[in-house]
Swiss-Prot record:
Reported function: Carrier of the growing fatty acid chain in fatty acid biosynthesis.
Protein known as: Acyl carrier protein
Entry GO MF terms: acyl binding; acyl carrier activity
Pathway entry: Lipid metabolism; fatty acid biosynthesis
Gene3D superfamilies: ACP-like
Biological process terms in GO annotation: lipid A biosynthetic process
Gene: acpP
Keyword annotations: Cytoplasm, Fatty acid biosynthesis, Fatty acid metabolism, Lipid biosynthesis, Lipid metabolism, Phosphopantetheine, Phosphoprotein
Organism: Magnetococcus marinus (strain ATCC BAA-1437 / JCM 17883 / MC-1)
GO cellular component: cytosol; membrane
SUPFAM superfamilies registered for this protein in UniProt: ACP-like
Family under the similarity heading: Belongs to the acyl carrier protein (ACP) family.
Amino acid sequence: MSDIAERVKKIVAEQMGVDLDKVTDDAKFVEDLGADSLDNVELVMAFEEEFGCEIPDETAEKITSVSDAIKYIGENME
């Protein structure tokens, strides 16, 4: 597992209060992990802080799964 993927999964597990083993690449934040809109905002903020990148609102709305976050961060990390 890449360092980015590992860090994303750790953030998701911590923010969502779920076990790390439930945070799979294809886990969707809302459907699989029980996130609400506030959780999504907090996840994006945590990703921005951890990886030193800015995620525009229109892009953040499209990040709905762990794999979406890993892909975006991998392509846009400073």
